Amino acid sequence: MYFGVQMYGVSKEWKQDPEGFLKKIYEAGYRQIEPCLGFRVDARDYGFWIPEDLEQAMPLLAKYHIEVHAVHIFLDEYHYEREFAILTELAQKYHISWFVVKSPARLTKDVLDETAARYRELAEELEKAGAGLLIHNEKEDICIRVNGKTAYEYLLEACGEKVGAEVDAGWMYCGGVDPEEFLWAHADRVKAV
């Protein structure tokens, strides 16, 4: 198993010295990074990348044998269809296995059901490009209950088997759920931690 670095939390170090950063994480044993991509707004000052940043980073990543298997994506919750072509191209060009989304801002049953339908559609489109879709939890979707489950569990189940889980154990713990218990209970859905 390889461990990767979520680039959001180390964006300052990356910006200051990309090559020095990659050398340091390579020496520490990391072989993957997971950037956060935005599409509609340039939020690079807040730790996000745009697709062009990924392209520019690839030669340096290759030099240090660092791969990108998963990418967090921040899309318009209701109109992400515009990004299908971009996501497909990224999956094929860079061999990205997983695109990672989060729960919607509003965690009501109706909104979660609507989101699940959109995520199923997105997962089907990504599957055509050889990639999959994962949902990353945050504290709020663990704290809020829907039909007796965490909002995160409810959304995962509503999405069906084509959508997997990327578990943030820290947020899960902060939300009051034992991460180990969750991982064992949902081992078939968890693709990344």
Where are these regions (language model features)?
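Active-site beta-loop-alpha junctions enriched in small/polar residues
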Residues: Q6-V10, C36-R40, I73-D76, S103-R106, ...
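Acidic/histidine-rich catalytic cores of soluble enzymes
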Residues: L126-V193
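Surface-exposed amphipathic alpha-helices with a cationic face
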Residues: Y26, M58, A62, R120-E127, ...
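A local structural micro-motif
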Residues: I33-E34, H69, F99, L134, ...
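N-terminal pre-domain/capping segments
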Residues: M1-K93, S97
